Amino acid sequence: MDEFLVWKDWWTQKYRFEIGEGVRYFSMKTALNIFHQRKGLNIVETGTIRALNDAAGGGNSTVLFGDYAQVYDKKFWTVDILPEAIALSKTVTEGYNKNTTFVTSDSLIFLKDFKEPIDLLYLDS
């Protein structure tokens, strides 16, 4: 599925206007393009989504990574110290989180103990 590498792919059509065409969109698309080209497997996000419908303010990286991971059969971990944030994350990503692992933990402890190689690390905690 190398159509992700072009600018009119499914991800761009779905998220370009939802998260805005500013720096946030282009930096996220660039990071995922590099991950995709290098045939990455594991994405780890520290700090999960904490508000509904906050694409403009928060960027919704949890949603973006979860959707990407499901489409391309990658592994995605989202880590947050707050149980209520993890609960919200599970709700918001319902329908495209089969490749997502939700972890309630301090991110420093999680990263120290994580045994898999991390191909894309998104620090948002």
Explain the meaning of each model-derived region.
Residues 1-125:
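A short alpha-helical cap/connector motif
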